[in-house]
Each structure stands twice: as C-alpha cells, then as structure tokens.
Regions:
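A general, composition-driven signal for non-globular sequence regions
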Residues: 1-4, 55
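Bacterial N-terminal signal peptides that target proteins for export
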Residues: 3-16
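Bacterial N-terminal signal peptides
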Residues: 15-25
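Sec/Tat signal peptide C-region and signal peptidase I cleavage site
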Residues: 26-33
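Primary mode marks residue(s) on the alpha4-beta5-alpha5 output face of response regulator receiver
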Residues: 33-244
C-alpha cells in the first residue's frame, strides 16, 4: 500500500521527477504490480502530446516566474524526443514533463493526463534532466516499462547516469500543471526541488514534524530529491499554506 510520503513524492515530482527522470530507477518493475494501477499500459502516444507547441511553451514557462522562465531555453516533445522550441540566455531549461518521469513503482507511470511544468537551473539541466530526456526517447520508440527499467539499470551499472552537480535545483510553481490524479486539482503546491548526491533525508530534517521540507531517495539511483513548498505560484498569486 502506498505511504503518505510516497503520495507526497508523486504529487511533487511527477516527478518524477517522480522522479525517475530526476531520480532514475526508484524501484523495481515488480513493485508497480503491487499497486493496482488504473494505467497498466501506455496510452496511444497522441494522448501524451500537447496539440499546440505554443501552448506547450507557455505551460513550460509557467513553472517559474517570468524573470526566470522568460529568458530560459524551452524544450517541447517531438516525434522522437524533446526538441528545442526556444533558445535561452540564462542557463535555465523549461519543459513539460510527462508521467514516465515518475518512479517505476508509480501507479500513474502511464497516466496520459499528467503535465508537469518544470524549469531546471543550469546545473540540473546538465546533470539531472538528461536522464528524463533519454527515457522519453525510449517511450516514444515503443519501449515497455520493463524495458525502460532494464535500460536504466544498465545505464546505472555503466555509470552513464551522473550524480547531480552541486547547486542542482528546479522550479515547479505552475498553477496549470497536472501532477497526479491524487493531488487536489492535479497541481499540489508550488515548490522548489533540490537534487543532491544520495544522502540521508535526516541531514535536511526532511519529513520531521513542523519541517517545511520533504525528501525522496530512490533505492538504486545516485540522487536524493528535497522538496520545499513555497507561498506563491509563478504568477504571484498566493498558494494555500501547507500543513506541517
């Protein structure tokens, strides 16, 4: 049965980065079967696409305040993977992540409704984002969940999945995203995500009573992700305070 921390992690990551793009190989494929999924198989690929590239660009930019996302590079999902839709000047990269950015055990791994706007800073764009971009290529080429997991395990064994660089973080402040069927309205809370080499959650006080930070550390991956809710969405409107 899914724990409250697992639910919180799924709402926040999508992410994934669920966070598999963000935290590759969170769990084995058999764990996905332990939770009865409403999405046991991938939907037709068209259901994962956004009809208008302009709409996808706007949704991606909504992940962070305009002062950050406006001059950021934007990637949108094409036929075979993500493609550059807008060049950037500040080192940030904004995308709309799909459901396969979640952990392998996530019951919503194939949820075609998920749209998770994220803006990565330069460090995470170099060291965290590429794992998700590669996974997307596998999905669009028709890979199954088991094949994706096997390839990820092989990449980990070959040390092709790097540790996050120092200072790696991203913004998830969009009011318009859909992170999970379980999240209220689909978009949970505006939050920042910090990626560090695998470490104990207690080093940040994550998950302790009253602590405004949560964390997730996969069993196989080299990444620990910390989530810090903030008080406003990217458009400046206030968010409902989170109960600690």
């Amino acid at each position: 049965m899914e724990t409250s921390m697992q639910r919180n992690s799924r709402w926040m990551a999508a992410v994934a980065t669920g966070v598999a793009m963000l935290t590759a190989a969170i769990g084995p494929a058999w764990a996905a079967e332990a939770v009865k999924s409403p999405y046991p198989n991938p939907a037709p690929l068209e259901q994962y696409r956004i009809a208008s590239q302009a709409d996808e660009i706007a949704l991606a930019r909504s992940a962070a305040p305009p002062s950050i996302s406006g001059p950021a590079k934007v990637l949108t999902m094409g036929a075979h993977g993500y493609e550059t839709a807008a060049k950037g000047t500040n080192g940030f990269v904004c995308i709309v992540e799909r459901s396969w950015g979640s952990g392998f055990e996530d019951a919503e791994f194939w949820n075609p409704k998920e749209r998770s706007p994220i803006c990565f800073n330069a460090a995470s764009a170099r060291s965290v984002l590429p794992t998700y971009l590669q996974r997307t290529k596998w999905v669009l080429a028709g890979a199954t969940l088991l094949q994706i997991e096997d390839r990820t395990r092989a990449a980990l064994a070959a040390r092709r999945i790097p540790r996050p660089e120092i200072g790696s973080m991203c913004y998830m402040l969009s009011k318009d995203g859909y992170l999970s069927d379980s999240a209220a309205g689909g978009h949970w809370k505006p939050h920042l995500m910090f990626f560090v080499p695998k470490t104990e959650l207690a080093t940040w006080g994550a998950g302790l009573p009253g602590a405004p930070v949560m964390g997730d550390s996969g069993r196989l991956d080299p990444v620990t992700v910390f989530y810090v809710p903030v008080g406003a969405w990217s458009d400046g409107t206030p968010a409902t305070p989170m109960k600690m």
